[in-house]
From Swiss-Prot:
The gene is MT-ND4L. Core subunit of respiratory chain NADH dehydrogenase (Complex I) which is composed of 45 different subunits. Belongs to the complex I subunit 4L family. GO terms for biological process: ATP synthesis coupled electron transport. This is NADH-ubiquinone oxidoreductase chain 4L. One of its GO terms (molecular function) is NADH dehydrogenase (ubiquinone) activity.
Length: 98
């Protein structure tokens, strides 16, 4: 069980490093954030199953819903910036203010 958690922690760390490395491009950042959320989802689900905490089994589903909302908002920002400026650089997000 510990090697599985170690692999999930490594996947989270690699995705976090990816956010720091590819922070200029919105699409790469969104993919890394999605990887982070999925590794957190799997870790929480495994911890709850391992400890037989049946009263909190809804927590991973709530986390997955928030992850889907985050992905939807991120893709909407990606479409808006790519239609307006033709690129997915994050520094263009400051230009979207009213």
């Amino acid at each position: 069980m510990t090697t599985m958690f170690l692999n999930l922690l490594l996947a989270f760390t690699v995705a976090l490093v990816g956010v720091f490395i590819y922070r200029e491009h919105l699409m790469s950042t969104l993919l890394c954030l999605e990887g982070m959320m999925l590794s957190i989802f799997i870790m929480v689900a495994l911890i709850l199953l391992h400890h037989h905490l049946n009263s909190t089994m809804m927590l991973p589903l709530i986390l997955l819903v928030f992850s889907a909302c985050e992905a939807g908002v991120g893709l909407a920002l990606l479409v808006k910036t790519s239609n307006s400026y033709g690129t997915d650089h994050i520094n263009n997000l400051n230009l979207l203010q009213c």
